[in-house]
Amino acid sequence: MMKENINDFLNTILKGDCIEKLKTIPNESIDLIFADPPYFMQTEGKLLRTNGDEFSGVDDEWDKFNDFVEYDSFCELWLKECKRILKSTGSIWVIGSFQNIYRIGYIMQNLDFWILNDVIWNKTNPVPNFGGTRFCNAHETMLWCSKCKKNKFTFNYKTMKHLNQEKQERSVWSLSLCTGKERIKDEEGKKAHSTQKPESLLYKVILSSSKPNDVVLDPFFGTGTTGAVAKALGRNYIGIEREQKYIDVAEKRLREIKPNPNDIELLSLEIKPPKVPMKTLIEADFLRVGQTLFDKNENAICIVTQDGNVKDNEETLSIHKMSAKYLNKTNNNGWDYFYLFRNNNFITLDSLRYEYTNQ
């Protein structure tokens, strides 16, 4: 039975079948979905390391289906529910490997999801192909999709660029598998979950495509990596998991998380600057007619004119056209390019807009 208030679900783990539990969630109430569904690996026999030891791969009951027809039907059902509960401005990430990601992509396109990117998780420490019978499978693929082609969605471009040394973040992420202290073990010292994802992967997913206080849902919650990262970043989470042993691990893990997002994680870089025309700054005495503007190297470039434009030795232009001229570009943001000298210091022209707004 569907509930009407999403607040009833926030920061909880729902125990049960993912499709049935998804049906209880209100329409268009989720900002971001991360799904790590069964891969339908179809592994047979034992996997042996080169030294003869048995390798503990994915051989769980939840990854077993009779055939592709059953698997496809299952995926179509949970994806339909995800589309129903996703906000029009939301997005969904689905991760998979060569065994399933192409089938899932086909289903998602048939359901009118719009693929924004296929992001490659390049594993820096992949599990080798022990038999030497084919290439080492060193990556997984994530499909990042909006609800429909024309829908807007959250993408924190400036934040991700800043964290990538001021270069555009790319669609290939080189990250290690979940190992060491991060890998959760059971009482026998074995892996608590065979496909636990690293927090670094979910960090990029959640930070890039959600905002503080957004609702992040994971229909295959496992040991709670999605919830742990969401909570740490100041987002709300909802998990769905059918096995109590995983829920117990996830709940313990989540209790230990103390949200403490920094300014970057709170998306300070995504705040749009106030719209204040140059002429307004002149009228409010934040700028003077005839005042000199400089570039970052403290070279005098132009002076401010009465109408809010700027003038060099040749012509009068807007701050944007003037900065583009000196950079040999077609267009440029003049607010970021120009500086002025005030109180024995060079300050950015852009800072005046904030001073004016905050006065």
Swiss-Prot record:
Which cellular components does GO assign to this protein?
Answer: cytoplasm
Q: Which InterPro entries match?
A: DNA_methylase_N4/N6, DNA_methylase_N6_adenine_CS, RM_Methyltransferase, SAM-dependent_MTases_sf
Give EC number(s), comma-separated: 2.1.1.72
One Pfam assignment: N6_N4_Mtase
Q: Which domain of life is it from?
A: Bacteria
Under which main EC class is this enzyme filed? transferase
Residues of the RAMA domain: 275-358
| Keywords tagged on the record | DNA-binding, Methyltransferase, Restriction system, S-adenosyl-L-methionine, Transferase
Question: Which reaction is recorded as catalysed by this protein?
Answer: a 2'-deoxyadenosine in DNA + S-adenosyl-L-methionine = an N(6)-methyl-2'-deoxyadenosine in DNA + S-adenosyl-L-homocysteine + H(+)
The record's Gene Ontology biological-process terms are: DNA restriction-modification system; methylation
One GO term in the molecular function aspect is: DNA binding
Q: Which SUPFAM superfamilies match?
A: S-adenosyl-L-methionine-dependent methyltransferases
Q: What does the sequence similarity comment in the record state about its family?
A: Belongs to the N(4)/N(6)-methyltransferase family.
* Protein name as it appears in the record: Type II methyltransferase M.HinfI
| Annotated source species | Haemophilus influenzae
Give the lineage: Bacteria, Pseudomonadati, Pseudomonadota, Gammaproteobacteria, Pasteurellales
Encoding gene, per UniProt annotation: hinfIM
